[in-house]
């Protein structure tokens, strides 16, 4: 048995389950494993150079012929170049962490790609719907990384109401990890679920085993939403570094951000000019202070230290609240099959209540 939803029909995937484009986590191995398991895997390109993204796409295509996606920073200076790369390589889905410009949406749709931005409010849902988005991901406050204050149980129905009548599939994110959640999301009216932390904690994830163990040790109160990482609300595991950031001075955090800006420039091969240009775009788009723009350089380097280098003391571990309830490391195939079968069981049980 399978679940057929507007999402599975739109993209041509077997199951309405999406693996989100987590920086430093969603590489070729995880994405291809998700795709081969019947879900939608999304490559995280924000922490890749253009050449690295091209190489990652090639790796995915070498081991799967199933649809997959690429997540792009809509405010990046080279967003257009990344879109053109996706089009040349025939990538099925373009995912955006911010609302992309109308021109980018039009270019992708002209090429036959499916455009799926992530949004955090009903007003944003209405905007991207009017601009021609094919679907959207809505993440509630339970989700990891940059997040908002509204729980999925309230944000999801508000977004569904905002786009009612448009036929645009809405994908629920934030707090999902099993079949019960998928069944609940479908009952709300969503077309599927997107998960980050749950896919990070699989055997197909390249995150170091020691870091995975640190996630599995977390309790339900083991995450915190902090603004000390990059100036914006960021849900992360409560680690020693995070506690220091929370209790330390802002001046010290600002100085650390300046050092990390230099490290990120060298790692990404970006010029100071392009970083400043991206900063100007970011500041205008989100109405941030210059301090917050500079602090944003903390994010990629601190996440890399934890998720790639395995240094949980010097790095930051973005995490959804679901980390506190997870206790296993299944393969993507095992995970998706279990979620779908469990969801079908719960939907059948619920339907039996109706007389």
From Swiss-Prot:
Catalytic activity from the UniProt record: (3aS,4S,5R,7aS)-5-hydroxy-7a-methyl-1-oxo-octahydro-1H-indene-4-carboxyl-CoA + NAD(+) = (5R,7aS)-5-hydroxy-7a-methyl-1-oxo-2,3,5,6,7,7a-hexahydro-1H-indene-carboxyl-CoA + NADH + H(+)
Glycosyltransferase is among the record's keywords: no
Pathway(s) the chain acts in: Steroid metabolism; cholesterol degradation
Alphabetical list of Pfam families matching this protein: NMO
Record note on disruption phenotype: Deletion mutant does not grow on cholesterol, but grows as the wild-type on glycerol. In the presence of cholesterol, disruption mutant accumulates 5OH-HIC-CoA.
The name this protein goes by in its record: (3aS,4S,5R,7aS)-5-hydroxy-7a-methyl-1-oxo-octahydro-1H-indene-4-carboxyl-CoA dehydrogenase
PANTHER family: 2-NITROPROPANE DIOXYGENASE (PTHR32332), 2-NITROPROPANE DIOXYGENASE-LIKE PROTEIN (PTHR32332:SF20)
Entry keyword annotation includes RNA-binding: no
A single BP term in Gene Ontology: cholesterol catabolic process
Family in the record: Belongs to the nitronate monooxygenase family.
An annotated GO cellular component: plasma membrane
Organism: Mycobacterium tuberculosis (strain ATCC 25618 / H37Rv)
UniProt-listed Enzyme Commission number(s): 1.3.1.-
Keyword tags: Cholesterol metabolism, Flavoprotein, FMN, Lipid metabolism, NAD, Nucleotide-binding, Oxidoreductase, Steroid metabolism, Sterol metabolism
Binding of FMN, residues: 21-23, 173-175, 196-197
GO MF annotation terms: nitronate monooxygenase activity; nucleotide binding
Top EC group: oxidoreductase
Gene that produces this protein: ipdC
